[in-house]
Amino acid sequence: MSGGLDVLQMKEEDVLKFLAAGTHLGGTNLDFQMEQYIYKRKSDGIYIINLKRTWEKLLLAARAIVAIENPADVSVISSRNTGQRAVLKFAAATGATPIAGRFTPGTFTNQIQAAFREPRLLVVTDPRADHQPLTEASYVNIPTIALCNTDSPLRYVDIAIPCNNKGAHSVGLMWWMLAREVLRMRGTISREHPWEVMPDLYFYRDPEEIEKEEQAAAEKAVTKEEFQTEWTAPAPEFTAPPQPEVADWSEGVQVPSVPIQQFPTEDWSAQPATEDWSAAPTAQATEWVGTTTEWS
């Protein structure tokens, strides 16, 4: 499919991306029309997709998208959550028209409704989940491209790209690869330099996980500010006292003599004797003692 050109051949880094995202892992079921894209079957029943065929169909789909003069006439659709972010990113990069979320029935056939569209090409994420736009595209003769798993039905699909369309990383990587090839064929980016956009931007992220990450980051920032106010106060400048210069260490350092100040002292033996503590108790003490006779 690549015509034997080295420029269009799959690179090693592309294969590593496919393997890391699990693009080659299909399902346990196999549609008879997808048998041509299967490489082997694992012992646990999972079919392995031939990545060489995946790359060839990816280039064919990119050529079909580039052939449309107006990029807005290409509709990219994903009703599943795992492909909605990728569809929006693909549309922003290539200028296509995205439909993320529920597809309104009659969008391609009912001319009365406000959401009516007449695209020239349709790209869907899952033929099983996006069966409604595929069916309507068959009514109005719109060519279709689909990311197909091993068990995906190929009815009304003109160009099937075999891949794992269930995993979030695999779907995001396939849309990223498709957008990169479209931009390369248009001449927007060069094949000699890597694309500055990372595949991570096309991956689906759970909103609950995003909220947890934001809360954790906020708590970490608060604790960091508290520690900074407590521990990062400016420390007083410490200057070491000058050391005396000693030429000969055997002589030692001479301690300067300090005059001792004389304080007046008193003769404690000359003072008069204090009271006799053995004398009789005071009257107040006798009164307290007298009151205690009642308790006896």
Curated annotation (Swiss-Prot):
InterPro entries: Ribosomal_uS2, Ribosomal_uS2_C, Ribosomal_uS2_CS, Ribosomal_uS2_euk, Ribosomal_uS2_euk/arc, Ribosomal_uS2_flav_dom_sf, Ribosomal_uS2_vert. Coiled coil: none annotated. Gene3D superfamilies: Glucose-6-phosphate isomerase like protein, domain 1 (3.40.50.10490). GO terms for cellular component: cytosolic small ribosomal subunit; glutamatergic synapse; nucleus; plasma membrane. One of its GO terms (biological process) is cytoplasmic translation. Belongs to the universal ribosomal protein uS2 family. Monomer (37LRP) and homodimer (67LR). Component of the small ribosomal subunit. Mature ribosomes consist of a small (40S) and a large (60S) subunit. The 40S subunit contains about 33 different proteins and 1 molecule of RNA (18S). The 60S subunit contains about 49 different proteins and 3 molecules of RNA (28S, 5.8S and 5S). Interacts with RPS21. Interacts with several laminins including at least LAMB1. Interacts with MDK. This is Small ribosomal subunit protein uS2. The gene is RPSA.
